[in-house]
Structures are given as structure tokens and as C-alpha cells.
């Protein structure tokens, strides 16, 4: 049983149906033996559970009559209508202001606890990951390149792409005239290079990286798809040290959140 919450809640709602009708229809799809009255009562309960104020009167409102944060709550209610064991949340805080983002993430955490439900969070926000997740998988070109406990990946990243992501995040405590970036561009999925998919952009790539595709290999408590991160790959090359330092500074700023 899987439920999904997508990036833009407005496009996930039918503009020609009230939110009450949409929820009722979805519940009846998952529970065909339920009466329409019971389904509507359950729809109201889901709106209340996800924090919609004055839920009774708002059942008959249209999607455009809700704020962005409220629409996201309604989409979460729709995702819960089938009583999922896994909730996939794809960038659930996109286009929301910071205070509303925090409320939505707290709602997802609360629902996961109360419903004993797993959550798969898809996001680029390292702060959200540090505050919310237990484990993190870093993906590049359609593959997992690093996976481990959140604190380990944030504080001790092993893959050059993870180092690059961490290093490219501006440090609010340090004044700088330029931003660190990862060289090059993401390859198309129909044109992934031989060897390691990241090697054209990697500052540490060597001949083996260009010819042999690395498997996920154990490195401490994590797994990393990198020859340099393998126990036989030796120390991280000097070319990656500046990314490491920037990544460490950012991880240090997240220490309290990750804890």
C-alpha cells in the first residue's frame, strides 16, 4: 500500500471538483464496499487529521480557495485515503515559504508516528533531510551513489558527488565572493558515459573511473559507488579536499538538527 504526495499540490487536485468530493471519490475507490455517507465522514476526518481549519465548512470549497500550504495538506489527506504503509513525498515543501515548510514536515513526521507509516522523502534540501530522515540515499544519473545513516552521510560524505553537493551549499557564517560548484552538467540517461557516471565531472577521476563502473562498496557505516571511497582506493585525493572542507563546515552547522 503506497500513497504519494507530489511537488505541486494545485496540479494534483481537480479544479472542477470540491475537495470533499475528491476525497470521497478517492476513498470509495480504495474502499468500494463503503457507503458514500461513510466515505464523506472519513474525508472530513482526514481533513481534520491533516490540520485543515473549519474542515466541515471547507469540504465544499474548491482547490483555488485554499492557500498553498492548505492545498498540500489536502493532497496529503488524499494520499492517506488508502491507509498506505509507505508515503512517498516528492519535494513536498517546494514553493512554500519557510514557516509553512516546517509545518508540513512536522505534519508528515506526526502522521508517520501515529500511523506507524514509513516515509520516502525525495528532496534536495539537506536541512529537511537532517531534521526528518533516518537514512539517506544520494542519487546521480539514475543510480544510488551513496547510502547510509543521515548523520554519517552529512558529516562524513564518501562519494565525490555528495561532497560536491555539500560543498556547493553557501555557508551563511563565511563571507565569500563566489559560490563553489560542481563542474560540468548531468548526463542524459540515454548518454551515460562508460565507467563511473560521475567521472566527467569528478576532480579525482583516474583511468579506472573512466573504464570500470564501480559497485556500491562498504565504507565505514555507509555504502559508496566510488573507487576512491573503497578500502583499497586509498585516501581522498587532494583535489577533493576543498569540497571536503566546505562540506564539513555545512555539516557542522546542521549538527544540532541532525542530532
Predicted regions and their residues:
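ABC nucleotide-binding domain signature
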Residues: 2-7, 21, 118-120, 137, ...
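ABC-type ATPase nucleotide-binding domains, specifically the catalytic core motifs of the NBD
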Residues: 21-38, 48-52, 65, 148
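Hydrophobic anchor residue at the start of the ABC signature
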Residues: 23, 76, 100, 104
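Conserved ABC ATPase "signature" region
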Residues: 38-57, 166-167
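Short catalytic/signature loops enriched in Gly
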Residues: 53-56, 149-254
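Conserved ABC ATPase signature
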Residues: 61-66, 70
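P-loop NTP-binding/switch modules centered on Walker-like glycine-rich loops
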Residues: 84, 88-178
Amino acid at each position: 500500500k503506497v500513497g504519494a504526495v507530489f511537488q505541486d499540490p494545485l496540479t494534483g487536485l481537480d479544479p472542477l471538483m470540491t475537495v470533499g468530493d475528491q476525497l470521497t471519490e478517492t476513498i470509495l475507490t480504495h474502499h468500494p464496499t463503503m457507503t458514500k455517507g461513510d466515505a464523506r465522514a472519513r474525508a472530513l476526518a482526514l481533513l481534520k487529521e491533516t490540520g485543515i481549519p473549519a474542515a466541515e465548512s471547507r469540504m465544499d470549497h474548491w482547490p483555488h480557495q485554499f492557500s498553498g500550504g492548505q492545498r498540500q495538506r489536502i493532497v496529503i489527506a488524499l494520499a492517506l485515503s488508502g491507509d498506505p504503509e509507505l508515503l512517498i513525498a516528492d519535494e513536498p515543501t517546494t514553493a512554500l515559504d519557510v514557516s509553512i515548510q516546517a509545518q508540513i514536515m512536522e505534519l508528515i513526521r506526526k502522521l508517520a508516528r501515529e500511523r506507524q507509516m514509513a516515509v520516502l522523502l525525495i528532496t534536495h534540501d539537506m536541512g529537511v533531510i537532517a531534521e526528518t530522515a533516518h537514512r539517506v540515499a544520494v542519487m546521480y544519473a539514475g543510480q544510488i551513489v551513496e547510502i547510509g545513516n543521515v548523520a554519517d552521510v552529512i558529516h562524513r560524505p564518501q562519494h565525490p558527488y555528495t561532497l560536491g553537493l555539500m560543498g556547493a551549499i553557501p555557508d551563511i557564517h563565511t563571507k565569500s565572493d563566489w559560490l563553489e560548484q560542481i563542474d560540468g552538467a548531468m548526463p542524459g540517461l540515454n548518454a551515460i558515459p562508460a565507467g563511473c557516471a560521475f567521472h566527467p565531472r569528478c576532480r579525482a577521476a583516474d583511468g579506472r573511473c573512466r573504464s570500470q563502473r564501480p559497485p556500491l562498496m562498504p565504507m565505514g557505516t555507509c555504502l559508496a559507488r566510488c573507487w576512491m571511497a573503497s578500502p583499497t582506493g586509498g585516501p581522498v585525493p587532494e583535489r577533493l579536499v576543498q569540497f571536503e572542507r566546505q562540506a564539513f563546515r555545512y555539516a557542522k552547522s546542521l549538527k544540532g538538527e541532525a542530532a
